[in-house]
């Protein structure tokens, strides 16, 4: 029997401590050592000894195979059988350094391999990281140059230089502040520095420009530096605090995207705090001297001609700017102040028109735009129990269609280098779905019904056709494939979940499956939807064994039946030991050719306690059916998820989800009482993120209001300052229209951050206006004077923010495309809000003072009437 063979193996292969002997020379350990470690040693194991002394050995009754565990895993690389090794960084290791080391190892190893074996360097995420970092650094450098050019037109060259020097000082200091947050240098952290690039100089511009204005009044350099910094110190401090308050909500956004983006506010806030210290302490110190040292004189001599040219251009630009202020801005502002209600009506109408564009769907909202990657992945799910051979036929068909598409595209483009870099195939596993490498999990036996084909494309910069287009063409070429339960195509860089995902739950499973079919049909009817599927999967085919009543008369029990069938088909584990790094198990079971079909079970023989053997069919019955691959439950009810992908050029997930919820699901729930639903995937992620972002935005607005109320010592003036925020949002929305972008979650991130940046310029303008009023200037003229005097710093801070972000806004690389919406919101929002601030804030202040005057007169009139009524009574 199997048990007797297993016992013989255990008796023969043994490694057992036997105690020790305490001799005069010391302790000696005793050990019985006879562990068999290789297959051929097991062939001589004596199973039993006959009465005549002859031995029945294991090789006489069976075959010993020293091999690997049965597995359903197959990997191919460019059509060739392959084994895949993945290397990951650990701890604080640098991904780029690890990549370079592995690349060098492969180059060294390639020449040492035997003929017919090759080693290739496949998917390298560090290469993508390196490309993104290079791209962002390039954008940052270009943005820095644009900021300096912008500063040099508005300010004295030396002043522009010292203002710009605040950028590297703040950036370097930020690396110290972000250390506790475990932030690393990656795409998002570098983007955060780009966001801060234009904003960080705002306070330095205000301080530097005010120092420059005091110099023009004839003050000595030291006095001008002190007076200029002190005069704007309060508004500068509070402007930084409002910016910090605006970026703070981004740190507390819930959901996957909130965690993903949390590094941005950490870095921007760190940079802003350091820029405040630099602008109020370090910058005035630099500007307090005339710069007549030896280095300055040498620099002036070497670059005399360029400096002279710059001075002429800067003076001409300054004269032109002053003429524009006097001849264009001031007349427009005076006209707006004479007609404040008309001006406010025009502004509000523009705001309502923009809101209507968004609400009417003319500007669409997508939670996470589809960002193209350099990969096209096809996931194949066959019915549970499908063999590797059957799955392989479907995979080979898809591989053939993928190669057909490659030939078509290569012929169309005429490029010498193919559009494909590599083709990976995995049968028994879906490694991309597990977000690991292309290799299977160590020790996994694989699942023959799963497969995946992944195509690596040339980098997006080197091809004219996008991965989404390639995915669409491949989907059409593959067509309907008989056999798979689901066939899913994807080419996005990352995803927050399925764009359409609805979970249906019911206690009645039959009712649930019927509702699932109706929902799938409804979703498939929307234009632009694809890969419509549900999460319910039938399990593998099962043979359920039962003992016949007559078997008990032979002394057999159900346990006997189960044990003998298990020994024959799964195996009886006789031993388990370690051989090198391998875990070796000695299994005793039927040969593989006797474990291939259902007839092998029916034809096996069952041994009775008396030692007799009877046919399986005489003592057992078989019931064949399907089990369940997995059972999902929520609150005790069965749950099935229906999901689908969409083509964003044709359909909008938000609109489809809304239509399903309002026009389909209510009727479905009426037809199936007890049915419940909830949205999952991207929609659930969106709900979590937007709800927390909205709540945090309200808190941030309140914090900004409180911060503004302190320097103004007023409850009403902060409302005038904050009135610029909605118009910044208008600029952000129109910026998306101009750039042909949909609004996305990152657009909202930019809008929230914009709210703090926009109020800074309004704060500076109204602070100067209050100063003029305190000096006794008429209010109307004070508004014109404040707008004119603060025109240059307001325009300059807005332009530096915009130009700092401009390279990112215009970036065409797919690598940075998902970051562009936030840059557009900030850049265009601040640019548009500038004109509203210069005209709208004075108008808002004019309206506020008119309302305050009305109530003051009303209150004074009531007081006079009361006094007049009381006078006769007093006289009497």
Label every model-predicted segment.
Residues 179, 183, 251-260, 344, ...:
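Transmembrane helices with small-residue packing motifs
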Residues 5, 42, 61, 102, ...:
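Residue-level signature of catalytic and energy-coupling elements of molecular machines
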Residues 3-17, 33-70, 93, 97-119, ...:
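Surface-exposed amphipathic alpha-helical segments in non-transmembrane regions
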Residues 122, 129, 133, 208, ...:
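Helix-loop junctions and hydrophobic alpha-helical segments within the transmembrane domains
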Residues 88, 92-93, 99-146, 177, ...:
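Membrane-helix entry/capping segments
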Residues 197-211, 233-252, 259-315, 453, ...:
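Transmembrane alpha-helices and their membrane-interface boundaries in multi-pass membrane transporters
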Residues 145-213, 270, 703-790, 795-811, ...:
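Hydrophobic transmembrane alpha-helices and their membrane-interface caps
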Residues 232, 302-366, 788, 865-876:
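Signature of alpha-helical transmembrane segments and their immediate interfacial
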